[in-house]
A protein has these predicted regions:
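Short, well-structured alpha-helical segments in soluble
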Residues: 71-79
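Short, surface-exposed acidic-centric catalytic microdomains
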Residues: 28-72
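Donor/substrate-binding cores of folate-linked one-carbon enzymes
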Residues: 22, 84, 88-160
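N-terminal glycine-rich "phosphate-gripper" loop used for MgATP/nucleotide binding
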Residues: 37-38, 61-62, 66-67, 80-96
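N-terminal Rossmann-like dinucleotide-binding module
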Residues: 1-43, 47
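Short alpha-helical
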Residues: 14, 42-43, 64, 93, ...
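Proline-centered loop/turn at the N-terminus of a beta-strand
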Residues: 4, 31-34, 54, 84, ...
Length: 160
């Protein structure tokens, strides 16, 4: 039975597109119920539409604070029938209340091998350090940026 997934994204949606492509190839068993984007005009919106997946554009600047925004996002996730949340280039920290609404069901895709090179510049930081091996990490999200338990990692040779 596939995971019922909500995808939170802020930008171009390349991670989201990779998920869609993997589902279509039959190598990822998820049902993407909704994409929630916090930035109007982000390319992920077009990608979701092209894939036939509902996309809710929820501009975070239209809420008075992070807590009320995260409550609205959690409500949208629940209304879509999703039980797991994937952060795919989502450039916002989540509140403890959001994480508690989906305990051990929020994952992040990070473009570096954690615990090395956390943060929004992880890939660039790895390159700046001159690492010979880099990769990506999928991990559970907790209240500390890029800190939660690692689910899976993939290592590849670094290229300059």
């Amino acid at each position: 039975m596939p995971l019922k997934l909500a995808v939170l994204a802020s930008g171009s949606g390349t991670n989201f597109q990779a998920m869609v492509d993997a589902v279509r190839r039959g190598v990822l068993d998820v049902d993407i119920r909704i994409v929630i984007c916090n930035r109007p005009g982000a390319r992920v919106i077009e990608r979701a539409k092209a894939a036939g997946i509902v996309c809710a554009v929820m501009d975070h600047t239209q809420w008075p604070d992070r807590a009320s925004y995260d409550r609205a996002v959690a409500d949208a996730v629940r209304k879509a029938g999703a039980d797991t949340v994937a952060l795919a280039g989502y450039m916002r920290m989540l509140t403890p209340d959001f994480l508690n609404a989906f305990p051990h069901r929020v994952i992040n895709i990070h473009p570096a091998l954690l615990p090395s090179f956390p943060g929004i510049h992880g890939a660039a930081d790895a390159q700046a350090w001159g690492v010979k091996i880099t990769g990506c990490t999928v991990h559970l999200v907790d209240e500390i940026m890029d800190h939660g338990a690692v689910i899976v990692q993939a290592a590849v040779p670094a290229v300059a």
